[in-house]
Amino acid sequence: MSDRVRVHVWIRGRVQGVGFRAHTEAMALHAGVQGWVRNLRDGRVEAVFEGSPAAVEAMLRWCQQGSPGSVVEAIEQRSEPPEGLPTFEIRPTV
């Protein structure tokens, strides 16, 4: 699993109510990235991307642009040890 990386991100801006989670899921499935995405009650979106370094980097670049109608103001990210997640999913808001 050493060829995998995991990045935990928090995205701030106009990222809720604009299809950000659904677009993130579609992009992750296309890129072959595992993990999850969810809305936070404070208005941010939280996500975990796990996969090859190139695929995770592609997801991070996509997050900077976001979905149509979104306005990304800032992204906080933290590297974490990969957990071997099996798929990508949209999780409930917390």
Swiss-Prot record:
Tell me which SUPFAM superfamilies the record gives.
Answer: Acylphosphatase/BLUF domain-like
Catalytic activity reads: an acyl phosphate + H2O = a carboxylate + phosphate + H(+)
Q: Which Pfam families match?
A: Acylphosphatase
MF-aspect GO terms: acylphosphatase activity
Q: Which Gene3D superfamilies match?
A: 3.30.70.100
PANTHER family in the record: ACYLPHOSPHATASE
Name of the protein: Acylphosphatase
Q: Which organism is it from?
A: Synechococcus sp. (strain JA-2-3B'a(2-13))
